[in-house]
């Protein structure tokens, strides 16, 4: 516990809040060629690289990821959720925030079923998270 004298000299400092998805908090004015501080829930971007990486220590897999250049000029690494994807270089994708715990440096997810990204095939449960349309009912 600080003394009164220490508080008079220094005072309490507020905790500095830091965004977990900073690339979504920057906009870009293409007419003035200046970045702006307008945040967005999602951003559009173009894939510059699509590949797989291995997760951190206790886990083992080949996780799919894409390197994406956003409309604000920032390049980020985004995770491709679901089984199978149709992305390749120059695909236009929509990204949202949300990290992948066992992939270092991956702070964004690609939204399935938006722009060039197809939804997951033959998915029946949790379809909205993977951009899958409702299956047609079987005729009797």
UniProtKB/Swiss-Prot annotation:
Report what the protein is called: Small ribosomal subunit protein uS12
| Pfam short name (any one) | Ribosom_S12_S23
- Identify the NCBIfam families for this entry: rpsL_bact (TIGR00981)
HAMAP family for the chain? Ribosomal_uS12_B
Residue numbers carrying 3-methylthioaspartic acid: 102
Its GO CC terms?
ribosome; small ribosomal subunit
Fill in the subunit field for this protein: Part of the 30S ribosomal subunit. Contacts proteins S8 and S17. May interact with IF1 in the 30S initiation complex.
């Amino acid at each position: 516990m600080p003394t009164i004298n220490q508080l008079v000299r220094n005072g309490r400092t507020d905790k500095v809040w830091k965004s977990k998805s900073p690339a979504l908090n920057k906009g870009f004015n293409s007419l003035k060629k200046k970045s702006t501080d307008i945040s967005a829930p999602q951003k559009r971007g173009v894939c510059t690289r699509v590949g797989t990486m291995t997760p951190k220590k206790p886990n083992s897999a080949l996780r799919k990821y894409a390197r994406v250049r956003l409309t604000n000029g920032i390049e980020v690494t985004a995770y491709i959720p679901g089984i199978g994807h149709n992305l390749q270089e120059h695909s236009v994708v929509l990204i949202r925030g949300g990290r992948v715990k066992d992939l270092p440096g991956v702070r964004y997810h690609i939204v399935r079923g938006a722009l060039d990204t197809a939804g997951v095939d033959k998915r029946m449960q949790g379809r909205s998270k993977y951009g899958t349309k409702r299956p047609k009912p079987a005729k009797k």
